[in-house]
Amino acid sequence: MKNYLLQIEYFGKNYCGWQRQSHSLSVQEELEKALSKIANQNIEVTCAGRTDTGVHATSQIVNFYSNAYRPLSAWQRGVNALLPQDIKILAVQQVDNNFNSRFTAINRTYNYIIYNSATSSPIFAEHCLWENRELDIDKMNQACEYLLGEQDFSSFRSSQCQSNTPFRNIQKAEFIKQGSFIVFEVVGNAFLHHMIRNLVGSLLKVGLGFESPEWIKVVLEAKDRTQAAETAKAHGLYFVGVEYPEFSFKRQIIKLFC
């Protein structure tokens, strides 16, 4: 039995998210179906981070076990030929049998993309959040400082979150402006359900001048979801990287735009 790692990219608009669901189409279902056909046996995969409905990935990491002998090219080109256009395998490699794409991960990186322009873009409308009002990035970054370290993020978790603990360790949270795009990059050991989108929703209130940077600290300390802002839309969020003890994968979405 061999353990294979896949780096995959997908556009999440047409899917209920990563995880297989009985009622609608998922990225996991499409990938497992294609892999199973190439392997001529049932294949089940594990991913580094389960994305929600409408969320995208430029560097999702997946692993699966199979005793079917296939060259690496078959696991990539052969499976890609069976996958829909909005899901593709970028790379494949054999890894140690102890490797688990989820539990071996040290941290995960997400990007949230905001198109900050007076006029919306037909081209980028499905790829990022449009905000026509000017955003104060300096204040947003001041607010981000309160997010760093291991903290209780109850104020930013959804009511459907099934995690046993609200504590998460954030190593980086920063807004970067590149032309008309504003990129929120956040790195953490893991994230709660809707956590990043809830953070973005609240940080936008700071950037628009409705709240001070210190307000984020107040919301955190409240440990109450009702004290934070509304959830930012899913289509601006991208899973872009994972770090493991021996290697890492990262493809920043803004580098694909610019």
From Swiss-Prot:
The keyword Iron is assigned to this record: no
A GO molecular-function descriptor: tRNA pseudouridine(38-40) synthase activity
Gene Ontology terms: biological process: tRNA pseudouridine synthesis
Isomerase listed as a keyword: yes
Assembly and interaction partners: Homodimer.
Binding of substrate, residues: Y110
Protein's name according to its UniProt entry: tRNA pseudouridine synthase A
EC number(s) from the headed UniProt entry: 5.4.99.12
Substrates-to-products reaction catalysed: uridine(38/39/40) in tRNA = pseudouridine(38/39/40) in tRNA
Function (record text): Formation of pseudouridine at positions 38, 39 and 40 in the anticodon stem and loop of transfer RNAs.
Lineage of producing organism: Bacteria, Pseudomonadati, Pseudomonadota, Gammaproteobacteria, Thiotrichales
